[in-house]
């Protein structure tokens, strides 16, 4: 599970996950699905798709020139509805879930943590800023 900010960070993670999958760096699980589970993150990803010149840097543009989409790849699943979100947790195959709320204080990531954090094979990968003290003092 990757708690991530919906705009920018999610798309950056998709870029790196596409590279990991393309280089076959996850031995034994090369075809693992990747879920983007956030309506806002899905919309932002669609904006990146539709406005490639404005959104991509030179490395991503070079991939596009080769016919490779830098953030969309086989096995990527974009989840918008709450039913789609809930269904992710019933599928027990190895997967990556990128869900909004980079600080885990709101949104669907809380649902995924509740249903998966207890599982020994689960990992939470923090890819953004985490303050030592929450805004409300926790």
Q: In which residue ranges do the predicted regions lie?
A:
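Acidic/His-rich, metal-assisted hydrolase cores and their charged scaffolds
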Residues: 1-138
